[in-house]
């Protein structure tokens, strides 16, 4: 039995879905524990791409059960559409392999509208996906939220909707002056969706608890990345949930269950979508080359990702925030055959050199300390035995500065293009 957590160690888009899909081969459960359909995971199997936003990456494995934990904010429209799209591709999804927590907070049309009008009416853009994630978490924390189980009870749903709409109605009408669905329109839509999705509702807390007690393998699949964590991230340019390992305990299981591995998924370079500081960002042809070769376009938003060199002070910070046990390095192939290769090992900041970021640091004011690395060349024939010396040096540089080992290396989009240096399912 192993409890394994997959955490994004950067600003998201690190390739968590690929690693989760690979580990799902031996997993009994794959669990999403935070975020919502602002996540976008791409799986490539036999040359065919599958895009996931809510459903865990274990869905392509016939024996693996997929769980959406109570920490996820759930857009029932998006879930219904995703299930329909996957089923149309011949992917089996039923109440036998998909379990959605009855306690998930629901995203309504009001949340999505509020998200959109706020972003369009402010001069300080956050770069939100516009999916209603933040407003839904606001309602959850202020006790105005609607739970998944509320969709199945007409009276309860109507009363919860009235509570949720009360303040928003004034904002829509008087401040933003936009049209919005009436309570009855939203009620009719949500109740109908509830009847359709009710088959997937489950006590996921007990499902996970019983699986662990029975010695099953459980993989917890995070969304976004530690640097977008609402507490640890580059605030205010963050998401609205705990994307660090802390989200596992608040969004899926209990602290009484130990974690065997916390794997930080990390690109061999750095990317970011939307606004916010980015110390190693490249604005030249090298950045454009990485962007093009890496296919750096957001699955959820379709926005071009900003690209830069690997930032080890931020990676070390992420490792500390989530108590990472190892790193899964992805998209190494993107850096193959480059004329120039650099890595950031530290910052010059306020007259000092620092080698690990921290919550109070102003990343807009740091000067990255970049070191030249010897370029390397790899292709699909790379193995642990024939790995070029320059790549080994690149990996060792990361390990030495961050202080934890690299446990796997992904060198292409398909599930077969990955080297494992550690068996995550082998204890001790």
Curated annotation (Swiss-Prot):
The active site is at 13 (proton acceptor), 41 (proton donor). Homodimer. Its cofactor is Mg(2+). This is Adenylosuccinate synthetase. GO terms for cellular component: cytoplasm. GTP binds at residues 12-18, 40-42, 305, 331-333, 410-412. It comes from Francisella tularensis subsp. tularensis (strain SCHU S4 / Schu 4). It holds the Pfam family Adenylsucc_synt. It catalyses: IMP + L-aspartate + GTP = N(6)-(1,2-dicarboxyethyl)-AMP + GDP + phosphate + 2 H(+). NCBIfam families: PRK01117.1 (NF002223), purA (TIGR00184).
């Amino acid at each position: 039995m192993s409890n394994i957590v997959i955490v994004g160690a950067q600003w998201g888009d690190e390739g968590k879905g690929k690693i989760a899909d690979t580990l799902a081969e031996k997993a009994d459960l794959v669990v999403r524990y935070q975020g919502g359909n602002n996540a976008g995971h791409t799986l490539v199997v036999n040359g065919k791409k599958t895009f996931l936003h809510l459903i865990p990456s274990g869905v392509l494995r016939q024996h693996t059960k997929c769980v959406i934990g109570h920490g996820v904010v759930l857009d029932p429209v998006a879930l219904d559409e995703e299930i329909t799209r996957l089923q149309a591709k011949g992917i089996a999804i039923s109440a036998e392999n998909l379990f959605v927590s009855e306690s998930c907070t629901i995203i309504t049309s009001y949340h999505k509208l509020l998200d959109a009008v706020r972003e369009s009416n402010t001069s300080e853009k956050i770069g939100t996906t516009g999916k209603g994630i933040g407003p839904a978490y606001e309602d959850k924390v202020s006790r105005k939220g609607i739970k998944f189980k509320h969709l199945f009870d007409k009276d309860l749903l109507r009363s919860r909707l009235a509570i949720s709409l009360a303040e928003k109605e004034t904002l829509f009408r008087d401040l933003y002056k936009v049209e919005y669905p009436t309570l009855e329109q939203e009620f009719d839509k949500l109740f109908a969706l509830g009847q359709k999705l009710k088959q997937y509702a489950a006590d996921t807390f007990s499902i996970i608890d019983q699986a662990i007690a029975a010695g099953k393998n459980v993989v917890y699949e995070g969304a976004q990345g530690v640097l977008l964590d609402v507490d640890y991230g580059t605030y205010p340019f963050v998401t609205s949930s705990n994307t660090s390992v802390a989200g596992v305990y608040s969004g899926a299981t209990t602290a009484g269950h130990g974690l065997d591995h916390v794997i930080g998924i990390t690109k061999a370079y750095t990317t970011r979508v939307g606004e916010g500081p980015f110390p190693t960002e490249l604005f030249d042809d090298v950045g454009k080359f990485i962007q093009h070769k890496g296919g750096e376009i957001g699955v959820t938003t379709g926005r071009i990702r900003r690209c830069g060199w690997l930032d080890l002070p931020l990676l070390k910070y992420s490792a500390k925030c989530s108590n990472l046990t190892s790193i899964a390095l992805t998209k190494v192939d993107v850096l193959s055959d480059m004329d120039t290769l650099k890595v950031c090992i530290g910052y010059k900041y306020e007259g000092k050199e620092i080698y690990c970021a921290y919550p109070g640091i102003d990343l807009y004011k740091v000067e990255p300390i970049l070191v030249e690395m010897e370029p390397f060349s790899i292709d699909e024939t790379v193995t642990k035995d024939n790995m070029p010396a320059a790549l080994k040096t690149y990996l060792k540089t990361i390990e030495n500065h961050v202080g934890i080992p690299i446990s796997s290396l992904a060198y292409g989009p398909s599930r077969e293009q990955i080297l494992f240096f550690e068996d995550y399912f082998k204890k001790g």
